[in-house]
């Protein structure tokens, strides 16, 4: 399967099945485009038939000379011989064994607080309450969750725990206790905990910063961008904005953080389709690592992203990608999460086919110890998997998630992006279509554009020119 596109002046050819990416000239681009409609995927290298070469030359004779086309075929044949063009999908058969795999729990999202000191308009957690009551996780429940993770992680050594909310800093003492407990269990069980924290920053102080810099492998700092954008969507419960209080704290934290991982994470909505300006605002504030995610909300919400918004959104990603390249070449570079793409290694096959592992390898834990496939399913009793005392008892739901992969989704099976997005978010699919094996269409279009931009950026930064 071949996917081709032009972005920011770069002609990109992606051989989907092998993962090979080629930045080519217009001639090679046009010849491959002509061939891709006539050559099927192949399990092994082959020679291009002379009759097809003649047909191609005749079709493109008004645009290119015979010599140019002949040389293009030499380059294309070399790529075919190296199995980097017109390759077959070798993973379709693998997925049958993949469905039977034994999974272990590798990561937990601990809902340390079902409470929040902000009242974000788009919050899927309903101001931290998750369709239920306000609650703070006790140390005892959190300890059982870590014990559950250790017991169900098999031979997996590296384990991940994200302190999530609501607002985790509203239960800070328990966060510290659980980190201490986790560290105390590492040597005895041959495990290594990677703790992360997501915070709105309201309660952030020097003591918390120092602890996070010592113990947290990653910290996510929630902020939506420009002051007017942030304060419209992320006010306090009394309606006042949060930007002026939070930004200085986040700047101080990022400076103290040094080269350790962190992300300033925002959400864009229908109200700020020029979200690229918010990304650049983060960069201008001095932040080096950032992400701005599209809101996912029902159509009836005034801030929801509609299908009609897509043309503007896709153009905005293109503009942001071009500015991203420009700033990197000027020595003012930053990291934008959705433009991060590893073309040489990347995730293992299982990850490429099934994504985040929700419901199998990754679970969410409520303040009272209930287990759900991920934080976005919390409160939906149809997806209650069990609790930290009994473990996973609803094996039917777990097995449904185990079967969730790109080949189980009609919309993903023949999509060029399938090995990069891994089928997308199961919660979004369920919320919009009632099935975890469907796909959220608006999200798909944005994801495909982000992948195209990320590949273009790789080509542009590898290009020594300043254009």
Where do the model's predicted regions map?
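Short Fe-S-cluster ligation motifs
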Residues: 146-164, 401, 438-467
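Cysteine-cluster motifs in flexible loop/terminal segments that predominantly coordinate metals
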Residues: 402-450
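C-terminal accessory region of radical SAM enzymes
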Residues: 311-345, 375-422
């Amino acid at each position: 399967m071949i996917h081709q596109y032009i972005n920011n002046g770069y002609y990109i050819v992606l051989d989907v099945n092998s993962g090979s990416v080629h930045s080519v000239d217009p001639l090679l681009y046009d010849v491959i485009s002509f061939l891709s409609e006539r050559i099927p995927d192949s399990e092994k290298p082959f020679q291009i038939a002379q009759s097809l070469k003649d047909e191609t030359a005749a079709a493109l004779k008004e645009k290119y000379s015979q010599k140019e086309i002949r040389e293009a075929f030499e380059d294309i044949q070399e790529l075919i011989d190296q199995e980097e063009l017109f390759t077959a999908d070798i993973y379709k058969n693998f997925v049958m064994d993949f469905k039977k795999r034994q999974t272990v729990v590798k990561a937990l999202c601990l809902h340390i607080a079902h409470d929040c000191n902000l009242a974000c308009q788009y919050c899927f957690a309903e101001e931290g309450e998750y369709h239920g009551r306000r609650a703070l996780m006790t140390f005892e429940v959190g300890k059982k969750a870590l014990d559950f993770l250790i017991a169900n992680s098999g031979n997996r050594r590296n384990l991940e725990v994200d302190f999530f909310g609501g607002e985790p800093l509203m239960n800070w003492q328990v966060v510290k206790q659980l980190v201490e407990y986790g560290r105390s269990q590492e040597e005895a069980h041959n495990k290594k905990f990677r703790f992360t924290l997501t915070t709105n920053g309201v309660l952030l102080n020097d003591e918390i910063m120092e602890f996070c810099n010592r113990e947290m492998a990653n910290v996510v700092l929630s902020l939506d961008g420009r002051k007017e954008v942030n304060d419209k969507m992320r006010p306090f419960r009394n309606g006042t904005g949060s930007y002026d209080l939070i930004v200085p704290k986040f700047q101080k934290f990022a400076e103290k953080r040094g080269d350790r991982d962190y992300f300033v994470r925002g959400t864009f909505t229908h109200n700020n389709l020029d979200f690229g300006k918010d990304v650049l605002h983060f960069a201008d504030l001095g932040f080096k690592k950032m992400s701005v995610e599209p809101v996912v909300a029902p159509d009836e919400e005034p801030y929801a992203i509609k299908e009609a918004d897509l043309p503007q959104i896709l153009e905005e990603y293109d503009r942001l990608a071009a500015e991203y390249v420009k700033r990197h070449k000027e020595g003012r570079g930053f990291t934008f999460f959705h433009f991060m793409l590893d073309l040489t290694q990347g995730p293992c096959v299982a990850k490429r086919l099934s994504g985040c592992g929700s419901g199998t390898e990754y679970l969410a834990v409520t303040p009272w110890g209930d287990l759900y496939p991920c934080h976005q399913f919390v409160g939906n009793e149809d997806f209650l998997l069990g609790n930290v005392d009994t473990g996973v008892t609803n094996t039917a739901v777990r097995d449904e998630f185990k079967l969730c992969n790109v080949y189980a989704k009609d919309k993903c099976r023949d999509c060029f992006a399938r090995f990069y997005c891994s089928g997308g978010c199961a919660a979004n699919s369920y919320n919009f279509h009632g099935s975890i094996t469907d796909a959220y269409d608006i999200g798909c279009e944005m994801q495909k554009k982000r992948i195209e931009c990320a590949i273009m950026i790789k080509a542009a930064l590898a290009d020594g020119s300043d254009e």
